[in-house]
């Protein structure tokens, strides 16, 4: 799935409602069979506790930082889901559900969850809680991802030991009791994986690689498409020298000590590693789905706070604004913005909130305070926030 960002627009109500603004946006951006947007819906913003202008400005700055933090955290959660699901051949959309809805369905029917985010709290208290929860979800899923990666790495190593070539795979299923020297104080076995193209050279030279190599002791144990496995009997006191010379000759030494029951032990370890990897994967994906859903909900609630604070700073008190959320069609963003700028140009010429803010510092007017904010690099006469779709694209 690849979609454009969601846009949340807030403008003065002038006696209208969110539904009326939806109708306005549809008239503006949908013309006959040509539509610049794929969906538009009311974005209901409840009334929050409003403090002084100084506090609102501080909250605006803090919300901007928290919005960026939350977007980054959710994007990382999303990346973990996509990377993990791709390796498990799952259906991505199942992990990007929000309260059993797609992100589009959730934002299009957004309603403030007052049982989760209590309205008797201040804006800062609510935003702090949302941010803390989302960052906690990110940290938790990173920890679970690390645990899964460790389990997966352990299982892959086990697989390599069972299915690799003779220079890598376990020898427990290859070496038998009759292939090794038992109970000798002087003799030991050295196991060597010899490249196929060097086998003749090895057989002609192994007895002279070092002193005290038992003549004609080389025994072929197995062969694959790349290597042939031999065991050679040498005296223990020259084993290290023999190993060094063998490596210099481009042979691969296999460190192995025969033990009764080793084959069964390794098979049990392999089975345990497979079960653990599967369990950790299931746990990671289950938690990732929860983490995305809960974090996305929190993020949209944070966007709601952003809309409220910026609308009051822009349009004044008491709160009297309407807001909608819509999704531009691909490559139509510039055209939509120009249409909105034309439609709401009067807001730049005659700011609504100049004389409506009450209980603020009388030494600083709203215009001066807003000038200090530098909220956006590009000034817009209306309040506009985006919900970047990259965090839930799949």
Swiss-Prot record:
One Gene Ontology CC term in the entry: cytosol
Chief location of this protein within or outside the cell: cytoplasm
GO process terms (BP): vacuolar acidification
Location(s) in or outside the cell: Cytoplasm; Vacuole membrane
GO molecular function list: ATP hydrolysis activity; proton-transporting ATPase activity, rotational mechanism
Assigned keywords, A-Z: Cytoplasm, Hydrogen ion transport, Ion transport, Membrane, Phosphoprotein, Transport, Vacuole
Modified sites of kind Phosphoserine: 17
Known role: Subunit of the V1 complex of vacuolar(H+)-ATPase (V-ATPase), a multisubunit enzyme composed of a peripheral complex (V1) that hydrolyzes ATP and a membrane integral complex (V0) that translocates protons. V-ATPase is responsible for acidifying and maintaining the pH of intracellular compartments. Subunit C is necessary for the assembly of the catalytic sector of the enzyme and is likely to have a specific function in its catalytic activity. Reversibly leaves the enzyme after glucose depletion, causing the catalytic subcomplex V1 to detach from the V0 section.
Quaternary structure, from the entry: V-ATPase is a heteromultimeric enzyme composed of a peripheral catalytic V1 complex (components A to H) attached to an integral membrane V0 proton pore complex (components: a, c, c', c'', d, e, f and VOA1).
Name of protein: V-type proton ATPase subunit C
